[in-house]
């Protein structure tokens, strides 16, 4: 036994040193400096060293001895800055060990990779000491960032994985998953920088079920000494719910960076395919270590992940996704084999061998190596391919849930957040701007863009066509347009938000008298100034809440301008009675077209077009209908007007009207349901009625209709009532109502006799059910299953998915006030207290 253990220790140390050497070889000088000095900066604590702060900061790493580089650094501090380095006190030190995890040291590490560092500490540290250590780590992150190195520290209590804690998407961590999969990744990718060796590697795979007993036997026999090893526990079996939660979160993360996430998403899919007897990759690597099979280029965890995914996709004969995952792997390694290198490193050798096995030709290598120069056609093709792969994973996840008798709403908040994000990113809707470049290519800018308008009555569809070339007949005729839409606003928005249109792009337009070049250039300047291209990704909280308009542009008279008729005419009007909506003797409306362009809190970009005399009324009703009563006001509202005449006047009046109506909408309350705004358009009076759930518009022909409409809205307040009796909603539900989503609100009755359900459909029509009995969880499961299986609303190529699943909420009382919280299958009161301060950053790391 002793010789066997010693042999294992030697293999472990050899592989760890190999990984350290490989990590340093792939790094630049600044990266090497940070990587090498981090253990020293955590072992010591001194005002002249980075990361210093006042207080009793835990210092000292168990079994740490400075290497040559670290000793040189300490000697320099002593020699040139007069620093006297004091070793931490003897005995068991607070920091058990410092480890990197993830792609560092693997073939997947690149010059742009960041560093994920686990600082494992003794469980006897108190709360204040942990906070001080966390603050020191934050200071070290800032120091590294000043050198151009991205480092993330994660404090790990040595006993945390024995608690089987879980989190939720709403807490911005890894969803309904326990920590076993995180531990799986740590065990297969960890590199020890300083401190204790990892004990788990010493336990044979066939003893995993009796992990603790086997470890105690090793200690009792004196084969191992307890205080020389980091013991985070064994890899126990995983439930179907845990796979579901982990896969859900990984799919969620893959939306923003699909190339990076494809391999890990498919590894989890492979695990679920093998369920209930999965082979965790960490166990596979450990088995080979024990057998002395140092395969896969030194048990490289990234290569072994590819190997496992290849086995899975080959077994199910999914060669389309297999080809995709190989390309993703190639791009991640970033070696560019089509270009000659003077120095051939180990990563290049690995990739060359794999490419030879895959039988790739030079043309494919050149195409992949040129990814930085991919333009819209290649990016759109890649986007569709990644989307198809993601949808396949989503469908397989739902099948896995059904196969194992799980509800797709086993965690309704989590599935709600994922579906909202999928819906926001991919559901194809009229007027929605599809963003096709989630970190696929760095630059889609085009030197030339041409907008061509085809009027009605021609062979081609009437509307606007966009080309990425100058308007010469030969090039236009021989190429397909990049995009078509009936309205110019949508094409400009698509080109801007996808990065084709920049300040350097030359614009051309063949507008057939509808829009000329100066007007197009003005619009492009206004849109680019008002809408930033890059925004932070929406938080899970934002995705679970009703969407809210964040940036709004109201574009007036872009395609139809009534003031153009004033040219060379004498127009009589009274400045004292000037009304741009009922102008002059003929009471003409000077707003002929309104285009809306807005970005919401889910980061969707939407466009809408309204034409004709009532365009202002229709646009107002639409804008206000998208603002639920408790919504925050938009961050910005801009009116852009492109009239030939009276431009400033029209713009100011529209801005005033919109601001006033938004104020009325967002400030209306249950006690003031009769608020209204009268507006005269083209000589006719219209009433906008600000009701509890939406805004209605009514034409008011005379005084009797006018006052009748006001009193009716004061009395009822609802434009639609499904019940014959008056529907009385809790005020907190009024504020949460949002168009476009089916919402269920559960409310406990005061006499504790069942519960009430308030259901708002996508048009905010209301149904109320009082004193319901039975299981809310079963209702949530059945409703979600019905919508996920029978309401296919999303169509993209061969993919059919319903993303707009109902949302479920619970009305609760907190400090005597009613609040709405996401409904969870486990009541808040019964949930174990979660240490979010420690859990969230760690779990973010695993699924990043």
UniProtKB/Swiss-Prot annotation:
Its EC number is 4.6.1.1. The keyword Nucleus does not apply. The modification Phosphohistidine is found at residue 609. InterPro entries: Adenylate_cyclase_1, Adenylate_cyclase_1_CS, Adenylate_cyclase_1_N. Keywords: ATP-binding, cAMP biosynthesis, Cytoplasm, Lyase, Nucleotide-binding, Phosphoprotein. It is found in: Cytoplasm. It catalyses: ATP = 3',5'-cyclic AMP + diphosphate. Residues 541-848 are annotated as: Regulatory. Transmembrane segments: none annotated. PROSITE patterns: ADENYLATE_CYCLASE_1_1 (PS01092), ADENYLATE_CYCLASE_1_2 (PS01093). Residues 1-535 are annotated as: Catalytic. Its main location: cytoplasm. NCBIfam families: PRK09450.1-1 (NF006977), PRK09450.1-2 (NF006978), PRK09450.1-4 (NF006979). This is Adenylate cyclase. It comes from Escherichia coli O6:H1 (strain CFT073 / ATCC 700928 / UPEC).
């Amino acid at each position: 036994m002793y010789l066997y253990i010693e042999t294992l220790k030697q293999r472990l140390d050899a592989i760890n040193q190999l990984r350290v050497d490989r990590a340093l070889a792939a790094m630049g000088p600044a990266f090497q400096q940070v990587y090498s000095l981090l253990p020293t900066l955590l072992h010591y604590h001194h005002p002249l060293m980075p990361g210093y702060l006042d207080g009793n900061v835990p210092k000292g790493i168990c079994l740490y001895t400075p290497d040559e580089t670290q000793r040189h650094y300490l000697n320099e501090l002593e020699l040139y800055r007069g620093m006297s380095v004091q070793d931490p006190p003897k005995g068991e030190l607070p920091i058990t060990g410092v480890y990197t995890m993830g792609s560092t040291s693997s073939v997947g590490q690149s010059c742009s990779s960041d560093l994920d560092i686990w600082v494992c500490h003794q469980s006897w540290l108190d709360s204040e000491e942990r906070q001080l250590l966390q603050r020191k780590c934050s200071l070290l992150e800032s120091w590294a960032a000043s050198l151009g190195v991205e480092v993330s520290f994660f404090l790990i209590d040595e006993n945390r994985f024995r608690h089987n804690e879980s989190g939720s998407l709403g807490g911005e961590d890894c969803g309904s998953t326990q920590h076993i999969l995180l531990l799986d990744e740590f065990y297969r990718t960890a590199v020890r920088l300083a401190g204790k060796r990892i004990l788990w590697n010493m336990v044979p795979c066939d003893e995993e079920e009796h992990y603790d007993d086997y470890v105690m036997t090793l200690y009792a026999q004196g084969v191992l000494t307890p205080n020389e090893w980091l013991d985070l526990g064994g890899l126990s079996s995983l439930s179907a719910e845990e796979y579901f939660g982990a896969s859900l979160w990984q799919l969620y993360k893959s939306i923003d960076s699909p190339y990076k996430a494809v391999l890990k998403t498919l590894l989890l899919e492979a695990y679920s395919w093998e369920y209930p007897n999965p082979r965790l990759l960490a166990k596979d690597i450990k088995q080979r270590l024990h057998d002395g099979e140092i395969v896969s280029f030194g048990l490289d965890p990234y290569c072994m992940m590819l190997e496992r995914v290849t086995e899975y996709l080959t077994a199910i004969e999914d060669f389309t996704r297999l080809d995709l995952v190989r390309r993703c792997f190639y791009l991640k390694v970033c070696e560019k084999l089509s270009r000659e290198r003077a120095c051939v490193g180990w990563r290049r050798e690995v990739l060359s061998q794999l490419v030879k096995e895959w039988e790739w030709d030079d043309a494919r290598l050149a195409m992949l190596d040129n990814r930085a120069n991919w333009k819209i056609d290649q990016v759109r093709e890649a986007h569709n391919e990644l989307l198809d792969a993601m949808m396949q994973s989503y469908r397989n996840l739902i099948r896995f849930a059904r196969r194992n008798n799980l509800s797709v709403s086993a965690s309704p908040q989590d599935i709600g957040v994922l579906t909202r994000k999928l819906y926001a990113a991919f559901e194809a809707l009229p007027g929605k701007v599809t963003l096709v470049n989630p970190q696929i290519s760095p630059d889609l800018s085009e030197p030339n863009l041409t907008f061509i308008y085809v009027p009605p009555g021609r062979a081609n569809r009437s509307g606007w066509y966009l080309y990425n070339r100058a308007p010469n007949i030969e090039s236009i005729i021989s190429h397909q347009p990049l995009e078509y839409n009936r309205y110019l606003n949508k094409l400009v928005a698509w080109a801007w938000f996808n990065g084709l249109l920049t300040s350097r792009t030359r614009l051309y337009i063949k507008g057939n008298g509808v829009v000329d070049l100066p007007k197009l250039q003005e619009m492009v300047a206004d849109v680019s100034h008002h809408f930033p291209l890059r925004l932070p990704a929406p938080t899970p909280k934002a995705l679970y809440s009703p969407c809210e308009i964040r940036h709004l542009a109201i574009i007036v008279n872009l395609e139809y301008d009534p003031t153009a008729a004033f040219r060379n005419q004498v127009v009589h009007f009274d400045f004292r009675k000037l009304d741009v909506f009922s102008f002059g003797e003929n009471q003409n409306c000077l707003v002929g077209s309104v285009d809306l362009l807005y970005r919401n809190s889910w980061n969707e970009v939407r466009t809408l077009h309204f034409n004709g005399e009532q365009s202002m009324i229709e646009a107002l009703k639409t804008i206000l209908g998208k603002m639920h009563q408790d919504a925050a006001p938009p961050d910005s509202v801009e009116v852009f007007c492109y009239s030939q005449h009276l431009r400033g006047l029209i713009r100011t009046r529209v801005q005033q009207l919109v601001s006033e109506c938004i104020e009325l909408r967002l400030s209306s309350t249950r006690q003031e349901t009769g608020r209204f705004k009268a507006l005269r358009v083209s000589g006719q009076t219209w009433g906008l009625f600000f009701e509890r759930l939406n805004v209605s518009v009514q034409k008011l022909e005379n005084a009797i209709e006018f006052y009748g409409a006001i009193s009716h809205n004061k009395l009822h307040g609802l434009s639609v009532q499904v019940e014959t009796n008056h529907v009385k909603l809790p005020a907190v539900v009024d504020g949460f109502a949002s168009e476009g989503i089916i919402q269920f609100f559960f409310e406990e009755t005061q006499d504790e006799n069942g519960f009430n359900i308030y259901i708002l459909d996508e048009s905010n029509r209301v149904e109320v059910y009082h004193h319901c009995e039975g299981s809310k969880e079963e209702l949530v499961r059945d409703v979600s299953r019905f919508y996920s299986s029978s309401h296919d609303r999303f169509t993209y190529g061969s993919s059919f998915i319903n993303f707009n699943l109902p949302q479920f909420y619970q009305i609760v009382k907190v400090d005597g006030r009613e609040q709405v919280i996401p409904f969870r299958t486990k009541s808040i009161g019964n949930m174990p207290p979660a240490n979010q301060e420690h859990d969230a950053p760690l779990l973010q790391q695993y699924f990043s």
